[in-house]
C-alpha cells in the first residue's frame, strides 16, 4: 500500500505591476523553485495545494465611488474578482498538469497573512512555500511581510523563497 503524497501548499498572488491574471514575481519564483528543487521528477510523491487570497477593497471598488453603486454592481464586482482569481490559479494548475503533479487550487478572501495561516490549520499541508520580495527594514515597517508572519504563525514548516536579483524591480515593494 502506497503512502500519501507530500502536500505542499504554495501561496500565490497577482502581480502588483501587471495585475491579473499575471502572477507576482515572488510567488512565481517560489512555485517554480518548488517544482524544480522539491518535486523534480517525483510527481506522484507530491500534491501541490495552491491558495490565492484576494484582498477585499474596503468599499468593494478600486476606482469607482461606492456611493453610486447598486447592489447588482457589488455582485458583479465580486464575480469579476473571482474570475480574475480563477485565471491566476489556472496558470499554476496548467503548470502542474504539464509535469504531471497532482494539485488543488482555491480562492479565499481576507488578509493574506491571516487567511494563509487559517488555511494551513484547516488543510494541514506538510509544509508551506511562500515567496519573499526581499524588502528592507524600512519597507517592512510600512508594508509588512506575509512571509515573515507565516514563518512565525503557520502551524507547519514554512519555506520562504526570495526573488532572483535580476527579477527585482527598481522598487522592491513592486512584485
Curated annotation (Swiss-Prot):
* Xref: Gene3D superfamilies: HUPs (3.40.50.620)
**What is an example of a Pfam family matching this protein?**
Usp
Q: Which is an annotated GO molecular function term of this record?
A: AMP binding
Q: Which GO terms describe its cellular component?
A: cytosol; plasma membrane
Q: What InterPro entries does this protein map onto?
A: At3g01520-like_plant, Rossmann-like_a/b/a_fold, Universal_stress_UspA, UspA
Origin, by domain of life? Eukaryota
> What do we know about how this protein assembles, alone or with others?
Homohexamer.
What family name appears in the similarity comment? Belongs to the universal stress protein A family.
Record protein name field: Universal stress protein A-like protein
